[in-house]
Curated annotation (Swiss-Prot):
Binds 1 Fe(2+) ion per subunit. Binds 3 zinc ions per subunit. The zinc ions have a structural role. 2-oxoglutarate binds at residues 1174, 1287, 1329, 1810-1812. Belongs to the TET family. It comes from Mus musculus (Mouse). The keyword Nucleus applies. Changing residue 1213 to S: Loss of interaction with DCAF1, monoubiquitination and of 5-methylcytosine demethylase activity in vivo. This is Methylcytosine dioxygenase TET2. Changing residue 1297 to A: Loss of enzyme activity, no effect on interaction with DCAF1. One of its GO terms (molecular function) is zinc ion binding. Expressed in the brain, kidney, heart, lung, muscle and stomach. Expressed in germinal vesicle (GV) stage and MII-stage oocytes and in early embryos. Present in embryonic stem cells (ES cells). Zn(2+) 1 binds at residues 1048, 1132, 1134. It is an enzyme of class 1 (oxidoreductase). Changing residue 1795 to R/Q: Loss of enzyme activity. Residues 1456-1473 have a biased composition (Pro residues).
Amino acid sequence: MEQDRTTHAEGTRLSPFLIAPPSPISHTEPLAVKLQNGSPLAERPHPEVNGDTKWQSSQSCYGISHMKGSQSSHESPHEDRGYSRCLQNGGIKRTVSEPSLSGLHPNKILKLDQKAKGESNIFEESQERNHGKSSRQPNVSGLSDNGEPVTSTTQESSGADAFPTRNYNGVEIQVLNEQEGEKGRSVTLLKNKIVLMPNGATVSAHSEENTRGELLEKTQCYPDCVSIAVQSTASHVNTPSSQAAIELSHEIPQPSLTSAQINFSQTSSLQLPPEPAAMVTKACDADNASKPAIVPGTCPFQKAEHQQKSALDIGPSRAENKTIQGSMELFAEEYYPSSDRNLQASHGSSEQYSKQKETNGAYFRQSSKFPKDSISPTTVTPPSQSLLAPRLVLQPPLEGKGALNDVALEEHHDYPNRSNRTLLREGKIDHQPKTSSSQSLNPSVHTPNPPLMLPEQHQNDCGSPSPEKSRKMSEYLMYYLPNHGHSGGLQEHSQYLMGHREQEIPKDANGKQTQGSVQAAPGWIELKAPNLHEALHQTKRKDISLHSVLHSQTGPVNQMSSKQSTGNVNMPGGFQRLPYLQKTAQPEQKAQMYQVQVNQGPSPGMGDQHLQFQKALYQECIPRTDPSSEAHPQAPSVPQYHFQQRVNPSSDKHLSQQATETQRLSGFLQHTPQTQASQTPASQNSNFPQICQQQQQQQLQRKNKEQMPQTFSHLQGSNDKQREGSCFGQIKVEESFCVGNQYSKSSNFQTHNNTQGGLEQVQNINKNFPYSKILTPNSSNLQILPSNDTHPACEREQALHPVGSKTSNLQNMQYFPNNVTPNQDVHRCFQEQAQKPQQASSLQGLKDRSQGESPAPPAEAAQQRYLVHNEAKALPVPEQGGSQTQTPPQKDTQKHAALRWLLLQKQEQQQTQQSQPGHNQMLRPIKTEPVSKPSSYRYPLSPPQENMSSRIKQEISSPSRDNGQPKSIIETMEQHLKQFQLKSLCDYKALTLKSQKHVKVPTDIQAAESENHARAAEPQATKSTDCSVLDDVSESDTPGEQSQNGKCEGCNPDKDEAPYYTHLGAGPDVAAIRTLMEERYGEKGKAIRIEKVIYTGKEGKSSQGCPIAKWVYRRSSEEEKLLCLVRVRPNHTCETAVMVIAIMLWDGIPKLLASELYSELTDILGKCGICTNRRCSQNETRNCCCQGENPETCGASFSFGCSWSMYYNGCKFARSKKPRKFRLHGAEPKEEERLGSHLQNLATVIAPIYKKLAPDAYNNQVEFEHQAPDCCLGLKEGRPFSGVTACLDFSAHSHRDQQNMPNGSTVVVTLNREDNREVGAKPEDEQFHVLPMYIIAPEDEFGSTEGQEKKIRMGSIEVLQSFRRRRVIRIGELPKSCKKKAEPKKAKTKKAARKRSSLENCSSRTEKGKSSSHTKLMENASHMKQMTAQPQLSGPVIRQPPTLQRHLQQGQRPQQPQPPQPQPQTTPQPQPQPQHIMPGNSQSVGSHCSGSTSVYTRQPTPHSPYPSSAHTSDIYGDTNHVNFYPTSSHASGSYLNPSNYMNPYLGLLNQNNQYAPFPYNGSVPVDNGSPFLGSYSPQAQSRDLHRYPNQDHLTNQNLPPIHTLHQQTFGDSPSKYLSYGNQNMQRDAFTTNSTLKPNVHHLATFSPYPTPKMDSHFMGAASRSPYSHPHTDYKTSEHHLPSHTIYSYTAAASGSSSSHAFHNKENDNIANGLSRVLPGFNHDRTASAQELLYSLTGSSQEKQPEVSGQDAAAVQEIEYWSDSEHNFQDPCIGGVAIAPTHGSILIECAKCEVHATTKVNDPDRNHPTRISLVLYRHKNLFLPKHCLALWEAKMAEKARKEEECGKNGSDHVSQKNHGKQEKREPTGPQEPSYLRFIQSLAENTGSVTTDSTVTTSPYAFTQVTGPYNTFV
């Protein structure tokens, strides 16, 4: 028989649908009608779906057809009629176990088999969706009173329609399809129902009659197999060992099977092995068809479940084809719709089923050998009939149905006698289409097994119960199963199955999928592989196995058997495990219910796989990854997919292909029904393993079930209604709907697709062990099959799939991976989603339970529902067609299956316990294995069900392509899916379950896991990759949702207030950090100290803004080697919840080396070091003296090596042919070489330490070492550093090294003075490294506050107290840095390029008045010093109102030039205002001042109320800020002070600055005799001008009316009040005045620019001054005051004084414009004005050099007390510090963290308290030759622009040359603006004479006040 089944051609064997055994009921016609209705006929796709009930009938036919198909001889009239093809498609061919019985009998047997294996379950699921039709049709088709495949033929026909490929006898399929297309489904369904009723289901008379007719037909075609007596319930009852048969009978609730199943469930012993499960199933089907549920109370839950399973098994012929495997797995799935069902079924039914599978493997062989023998115990079927045992069972089902029903009812106590039976039938019916499909796919494989009986029983039950009943049963199963926690069981079973299938996969003939199954537990392989191989040896068995597996996976029969076997076997873990299995199964059942709908087509394997998948879904992602059966030749799955054995290799392949797609779709659709069914059976399985415990629960649940199944039955009955409006059992409704409406089409599709595609899909599912099995069971049997039938079916099917199973497995897997991926992912994503929506739904109780037990599986169940619902459309026929498959010796098979099941239960219990801890673990494997999984596997996680369905469709289509199935089928399936989604409320709910919110829940769980897994490897990347799954979800979700729902915000590190980086180290907790650091350092225990710090974001600083420390970490002892500061990220549980922010290696470099370096560096740098001006050297107000008050000893920093240059945007040596990395003052190459050797050696020593302690940062920094070796420090390979900064007693204020390389860090080597080199010694003075944003944690690394307090007591943590410290505010600038000193040269270079004739003239003229002006300037300077001596120079003083300023200015006397701070800006390069406006002048001045004199000599003008107008610039530390004219007068010093106008931002930033930030007015030296200058406060003007170089700035100035000030100075000259709010106006006014009259009057008019205090005299002087020559050579230190003045005024006039004035070219333009616009300003000057201006200029120029000599004395200092008490009062203000030791190495991410160093009490760089060597690598240092290529490219571009600009004029060229100027200068050339301004002045103002000066009235009038915008 097996050989025949294996070898017969498609045409040879009658497909379950095609071969409708000529039943006296004229089953052929109903089959035709059913096929029309349920087949994928184009004419009535949905009617076919609606005819899912007919599919059940077709499943019977499928079973028969498969029996025929399996049999080489197509005795079945259906097969002769051409239903064999449909039967193949529907799984009928799978049932063909004997050539002689290939006709009706194989169909029946396949039906039983499919029922047993889950085809009935598939059919039932289809029926659950289309209860009305599916229930009726199965009754008609497979459950005739005679047990003959009359209805099976009809089922074959509908299976053929649904699965034309299965239809070897296309005639019957066509007839059935026609009939269905005509009315068909309803009528056929009614007939089927009648037929199913005679099989033992309490169904309408017409249903019974149909069943009887079918049985008669089957008896006629397969008298032996159909013999009802053969399938005696007693035999099955007596053979509890054949739990597969029991499960099949439970699933099928066929008469004999039901009885046997009852006995099985009641009696754990596997004594029925001789009787094929198919027989039992068949008998149960008959009985169940005729006798709804004999014993409602015996096994209330199990019985109900068994009944449901039976009903489900009746439906799916694939399960029957799967035979006992299918049946058992179907029962298992019915009892454990999800993995729980599979788990229990796996142990009980799996073992039974495995035995049956083995028996089926062998049983198929035995079927061939003893088709009758295996059935003989219960049925008197010939060997072929034994293969077609379902037929024989169909005859006994009348007998056994009652028993089975009784047993099922007893088990199910929840169901009423009839109601339970009906529900069982309905559940079976729902699964029957699936089973039929599966069996149809592998009719021969399943023929020997009782899946046929199961399908018939399912059919009978389905026929007996209304679709509503089926739905009720399915719903009940769904509810009950979830209540029983099927998800856990399912997961266990799934896991176990996954292992087993994976193990079996290698055995699978299709080695392709072995891989996936190999991952499964080897136990399954061992248990199932032999059977699988045996089954695999039979090609027909493969087909049957495939269908059986599909059915068994989906078939409730297998679930029932599994459940009964569980109960009978009394698995040690059966009952105990059952709760967990139930828990697991319930969620997974839900998922399966969802998936079964999707996976009806591939349901045999897919449902089973799905159950496993739900387990293996997490455990086994690889099978899931494999999209094709070849990719996943899961031997374990193969047994489930026996239909390949049944089908010829060619026909199997073809059928498998089509069936694969069909099964994918139907399996997808069925998957949901399976999920429902499997949920219900899962509950039953859960009860079954724990029958004792479960029965009690069942009794409780039975009440619920009775209610729920009834409801579900009603829901099934109102399948369309459910689709339209039923929200009760989303899964069930979806199942029923999909099974009903979509099932027919799915069946039609699956008839072909499931024959081959289904086989391959099953194989693929088997190969993709967790996936295919889970999906397939879910597909075929929404219920337990995935768990129970999965293993047995997988074994048999793998045995059967060696050849064809591969293909079908491939196809099924292809679809399944799609399903699996959708299912797994969707299950994962939707498990919780599905759980929530399901909980919300009528299934909520079940789902809640499932969710509580296995939230993910419920989502999976929902997904299964969805999938099954989608696949139900394609799989309905297979359920019908595969009910007659396997009738091997029930004893051996059942014993084997029982043993396997027991073993599987144990294994699953273990796996479940492992997996039970959480679905997250399951999910975690999914996450781990998604790489190997198909893309579809990844799909479902985040996307909604809509996406899921589309993905499923895509997956289905791809399998169809793989299987060669017509695209039309795929399209049809997709259409069904679409329709299902659109129409089915359940689908909608499934979508709701898949809603993002639900998805978010699992993803949140996964978020932490993903973070945990991904963050460690790629912390930063993990932002996106940690939670790849989460990201998908989070992308769609609100950013904060995960943090709300989840426990970790690791996916959103950007939310962290503190910086996020992990290249120093990160871990999930502090202990992980300790482990990490111990591994890095190599020591443990006390050697590693970890301190937790908390980021507050509140910077600790003194009242002056200087660094302070509140807590100090000190080295506790010599034992402590390493201190690690870590930040615990709040609300994070990810792998980077704890970050390393600093690593202090106390013994970094040898003490000897440290001491040597200290002495050498002190010597070299003290003598020749060139100080580097750093902004961090002072506070924000630039007035602190943290570096020291003595410029000769103050702290300083020196930079060496390569560093990033903003100018080059690369290495600063880009243009250097011979870069001097260690450049020292003067030409001292020896000293430079000496210094370089020390630093190079140090870098070489530190590099390996750095690599050891911070490998990630090190690797990042050495990435471009070979590309840019020139920019590296070090003598050996591995040079992470490019530069070194040596800080000697240098107090760095809070800052970040933003120019550092990303993902790098800085290494700080500390060299302490001799008195601070011992551990524990507390020196008199020391410097701390501070993290001002952090506070210490209240507890230590172990969470102990006592430990922290102990550290404080011991002194390792020093808590500082608030303190008041005397500080000095420096009025003058500190000594300029070496860089400033070098500014003169740079200024000269730039001056030469920018020099203009006008500037030269101006400079020459200014030089004339040098001597005279110098004297005057000196006098003014002294006066200014006196004036500035007042302590009002503080920033707030600057803010004083102009009147006060005037008063102060008038009262003040010039001060002595003060030494500028060493922070003046660098060379007058494009420094802001002064340099550019006065390109040469400012530069020269700046350089000169910066050089020495003016830097230190700069003074505030005596007039300025802020004696430190120069100090303002000093505060900013810019060389240019230094008073260009420091000594000439306060005005000259502050106004013209280059530092002032060099730093336009001085005034802008610090309007309060004591010093006029801009030297314009203040810098203009004025004779002491000049009353206006004397009274005028140039500082205010400077500040205002410079501060507001733009018009807006001037307008913003808070200046008193210029006229008032001017009046005071000038008397009442209104012309003096040239106060224009806008610099442009002022500038224009000045130019106009000067142009009109270069007299002092013009100067007076010019005065408004700087400030109201700017008198006309001053203005005149300024006009006379070389302001007309802004380009005068300032570098020459001959800072012609006129030039500066002109520059400042020009800048003001140009309106770009601040932004553009700094640009030399702009200065040139301005100068040129002024000289041209104001020729008199340059040349026309009155003698007095000229003298004044010259005197100012000369004095300033001379004064500067003098000041240089007075550096120290020039600085005006104000003592004050800096208080830090407020920092200590607020515990949230940071100030964590580390006391570095001599030779210590500190590693920190200076680019990310704000850091600082405290002030040394007595800084002395000649003998520093601390030398810190900061090694770093700057950004953009990654090109050879110091990034010369970048510079060359930049210069080439610049040259090109200049060349282009040259055509437009010099001004334009200059702008091009100075991009920054161009940016700053919104206007074009300055000349036009001046002209416009002059014109406006001339138009709006009149000239007024005051004294001897003439000024233009525009600003001379007092009315001109305020913003002065009227002249703009």
